[in-house]
Amino acid sequence: MNEQFVNEPNEKPRILIVDNNSQFARSARLLLDQSGKYVACTVIDPRRALETGRSFKPDLVLVDLIMPQEDGIEVAAQLEADWALHGVPIVFVTTLITPEEARDGRRINGHRIVAKPARRSDLLRIVEESLPCCAAA
């Protein structure tokens, strides 16, 4: 097993970004990294999400809803079925809804949604609210 990523106690929450749009994935990773509160990793090919998730051990996964090869719902189902990743919160990102609809609390299969293009403040807020360590705070 690849032990490149190891989650240590008191470590910053890890966010896995699965999006075939490399520009969005890079921008989201940069935003999260520069916030100083998170460590982010990107996956451009959704078929590598499970493998990367197992090694990166994320605390939260942002998944694009519409991707070639596998859509976000398929990726989410794989992550949820995996013993090591079951229970990790998943947030969908998509162009299929407006920011207003996302803020109104719309969900897909019980998962929160962020509208693309995402405002920086909306993305940071939903990440913080979705993390188990921060949701009750």
Regions found by a protein language model. Name each.
Residues 68-69, 98:
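The feature encodes the CheY-like receiver
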Residues 74, 97-115, 121, 125:
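Alpha4 helix (beta4-alpha4-beta5 surface) of REC/receiver domains from two-component response regulators
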Residues 44-48, 71-77:
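Acidic catalytic/metal-coordinating carboxylates
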Residues 42-60:
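Acidic, metal-coordinating helix/loop segments flanking the phosphotransfer/catalytic sites
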Residues 1-16, 119-137:
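Non-catalytic signal-transmission and effector/linker regions of two-component phosphorelay proteins
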Residues 22-41:
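Two-component/phosphorelay signaling modules centered on CheY-like receiver
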